[in-house]
Amino acid sequence: MEVGKLGFIPKLFEVQQNVKGEDIVENFVNFVEWVNEKQLKSKKLKEAVLEGRDVPLHEIVIEAEKAKVALNLLIEVRNKLLEAYNELMKMQV
């Protein structure tokens, strides 16, 4: 197993000086796709074990945890976005 740098995580929410609405939406879509990839990779490893292929147990557990953490992060980001949206809707014009 190869151990790489910690910089492999995509820089999805970098702070930019001129942030446009489209960029935020595009970043969120990229983030959702990244989480989906983690979920699919975990699912493929689990299916490989069920098919009888030789897959190390630690790889399955690690990928399952990565998928779980990514999904939990996505849920928290969604909750914060909804909370911000609700606060904006409560503001009086």
From Swiss-Prot:
The keyword Disulfide bond does not apply. GO terms for biological process: bacterial-type flagellum assembly; bacterial-type flagellum-dependent cell motility. Its main location: other. GO terms for cellular component: bacterial-type flagellum basal body. InterPro entries: FliE. It is found in: Bacterial flagellum basal body. Belongs to the FliE family. This is Flagellar hook-basal body complex protein FliE. It comes from Aquifex aeolicus (strain VF5).
